[in-house]
């Protein structure tokens, strides 16, 4: 992973030899292993490239990379498939070699159509004065742009600035395809014209599915001197996933399971589905494709390969290379179980569990069958889960910290220890006070969340930042000790809810518009995931010099799930804890998981209790005043005390 940036000026009076201090600082946070700047000048424009590398595979390759013809490449991504990269090779150099050999724009598009994995990039084509840039289909890597000085300059960057003046001008580059700017023409016309090469799907019948994001949608928030146009040759990138299966069942879904639609979730209900031969095949196919996705994401990183036998035996001293954002819910439990299959057994795995603690609260909160207002009896935790919660809470030294995700996390830890007792599972209890939340939101986090600006973005962005920082308490046999996770790779379960009808709004849509409406909701979820979640989470996690990886958004996983009819992925006639993400729950049972397979969805902002920390009368979609960017004079707080 890297922090990449390109600052372009079309006026000599704005030429600069360096980036603004706060932007450079933010980029270096993302890439602690090497930093380099490169200046490319023409008569009428100047490009300042800056790249900061987090080394994760092959030989450390300093960026920007430049070839003998003056082409410059900045790459923030991982090639997991599509283009062959050997274990000892660096994907930046491999991709740049291919890119340098491309003879025309069609070959460039074909190259990026083949890449599977998360990416954003900037490519300067010297001979033609073109600047190419873009993000992968899902937008798993951040890239922002801002245009200023009435078209005399613009900037592309993985992350924005902390200062109030520029902060509001940054916007996310849409994950709509590749963009190309003719720098020489821009100087002549005085207007910045972005040529778009969109994502399109070509069916076997040679029918082209148009990109969802229209040119007008992309242009809507841009300044008047910036326009987005379709590329003149009408070329495109091939979408890396198949379209969503919109098929509807011939018989009403309710008739298959009407006798169990009003009972609490139990393992026996899931076992009924496992007796179906076809369903069992689908479950195994899902496990296989998701397992491969996890394998790619936990093995593509450097490890200590030359340890002595004695060093291998000292597993308590071994460093975890992989961490998981861990609530103990179904998504993180399945990811952890599959990661255990592929990570060397002598290597610990960090489970990062975050809780927000209001100091004035001294009484623990627990699951209460009668104290909570239940909408229906389907929300009552299963008997099996309640027993596991009680056992896990009794063993914890931080018993007063009992927010929902901490309770389910402790119970999930016990499940994982039962499934894989030889593994060292580092359950990292990360407790955040109101004071720490407010201080670090102001000095470090708010600019990472922006340009997103809602209450929901604030809650999730802050929770993910503290969780991925990995500073907390480790409960070990010898007692409780302070701990900081140094794992460079952080796995997250984003994408499971969107594809498998995990959100409460999916159930609402199903109840009002049936399976057809549910299909449309899932299609909409996948279409907007790049602008809703992924850029924000990449910026937040990357700020710690760590890389977010998303197994549920692996291209092959998404294509597999898209190919299935909706009723094989979810059955919302069934109660919470079973019907949503049904396929994932069945996979969890097959993998040997128990109580966690029945946990209903709980959003991170509620499970971690960050939503209870401040104003409780806000709506998730409200603009969040707490995300206002700080002024220049306050920047020194973070610079003096780096956390």
From Swiss-Prot:
Gene Ontology terms describing biological process: adipose tissue development; asparagine biosynthetic process; skeletal muscle tissue development; transdifferentiation
Active site per database record: 2
Ranges of residues in domain Glutamine amidotransferase type-2: 2-184
Domain Asparagine synthetase: 285-601
InterPro entries, per the entry: Asn_synthase, Asn_synthetase_domain, GATase_2_dom, Ntn_hydrolases_N, Rossmann-like_a/b/a_fold
GO MF annotation, one: asparagine synthase (glutamine-hydrolyzing) activity
Keywords, comma-separated and alphabetical: Amino-acid biosynthesis, Asparagine biosynthesis, Glutamine amidotransferase
PANTHER family: ASPARAGINE SYNTHETASE DOMAIN-CONTAINING PROTEIN 1 (PTHR45937:SF1)
Name of the molecule in the record: Asparagine synthetase domain-containing protein 1
Organism field: Homo sapiens
